[in-house]
Swiss-Prot record:
Organism: Staphylococcus aureus (strain MRSA252)
Disulfide bridge map: none
Extracellular-side positions: 71-460
Superkingdom as given in the UniProt entry: Bacteria
Gene Ontology, cellular component aspect: plasma membrane
Classification lineage: Bacteria, Bacillati, Bacillota, Bacilli, Bacillales
Entry's Gene Ontology molecular function annotations: zinc ion binding
Record's keyword annotation contains Metal-binding: yes
Function noted in UniProt: Plays a major role in decreasing resistance to glycopeptide antibiotics.
Protein name: Membrane-associated protein TcaA
Residues in compartment: Cytoplasmic: 1-49
Amino acid sequence: MKSCPKCGQQAQDDVQICTQCGHKFDSRQALYRKSTDEDIQTNNIKMRKMVPWAIGFFILILIIILFFLLRNFNSPEAQTKILVNAIENNDKQKVATLLSTKDNKVDSEEAKVYINYIKDEVGLKQFVSDLKNTVHKLNKSKTSVASYIQTRSGQNILRVSKNGTRYIFFDNMSFTAPTKQPIVKPKEKTKYEFKSGGKKKMVIAEANKVTPIGNFIPGTYRIPAMKSTENGDFAGHLKFDFRQSNSETVDVTEDFEEANITVTLKGDTKLNDSSKKVTINDREMAFSSSKTYGPYPQNKDITISASGKAKGKTFTTQTKTIKASDLKYNTEITLNFDSEDIEDYVEKKEKEENSLKNKLIEFFAGYSLANNAAFNQSDFDFVSSYIKKGSSFYDDVKKRVSKGSLMMISSPQIIDAEKHGDKITATVRLVNENGKQVDKEYELEQGPQDRLQLIKTSEK
């Protein structure tokens, strides 16, 4: 369609004269317009052919850009740079993320210790150089899959390993810190509470038993902790240093606000050593001059006393209180017995025992003769007066005499004797019919006019 330049009437392209006003159209314009339309159509065809090529070229450019972007973040060199930057910038959270594994969660505090350990024991410049060289060699190698970065002293501090690929093209490098188990060995059952792997942790260790408290990456640690024993609760730290271990474990040094008590006794020479006890905060324990008692919290007073026996009687010291302000890591205390009181009692009891022993010597001398006569004559009456009638021992000896199985005895010696009311226990050493010495324990009863009779016996 075209418009008449004179009246504006619309007309077909091939019309020569306007039907409205009779204006004669210029045929050259129609030819020009036709030629132009054909050119436009030709150009459109060319453009349509070029579009797929342009799209393909654009996609290729995008792929190349994407490859370089992926390489910048996923190549072994890029992975190495991420770890190096985190260590250089003390980014403990990033280091913790990079070193954490499914089996061992590393928290930011461990990572902080690890960063400092690398800088102290390897040196940052040397570490970066060693790491880059190790990654380069592993990346080029067709056989090696792992290698270690070491400290100046030769301890492994970082394991670098190949772990598959990233996006087909790039080796995936895995960075893992080797671990060790810190171990405790408390003197008594102890509960430890501290933070590890970003979580609160509790470890219960039995007395004198080696107990691991977890797995830790290399470092010099001073971990805030609480510990609890029968003696109380303690605040302090668990300390351990990887430099001090060449094995899979590292010893823990406990650093708590605690007091250990050394006890010295005076006036105790007459007391039986096995009977001596120390009571600290109402807890009684055997005494030893070489033993250290505790630990006890330094923020609470301690009460302490001692006891011991002499000739069956218990003697005690006065109870002393050690103020919390006077408690030190090693605290010494002296407890005094009333030595005069003990000596007077021992002297009195020894006189009584000597008198009792003399009576028993006389009694058992007669008893052994009567026992042997009853055996030789097969007559229980010889020995019956030495044994209390109605006792199980009375019936037993009578039966043995009738069966001829009574044992002959001789040379009785009184080893020990104690009297409690009308009952006497005596340890007697005898020679049996085979000529062998045997120790027997007898129980006797003292009746009217101090008459002694046996009621029980047993071999010691």
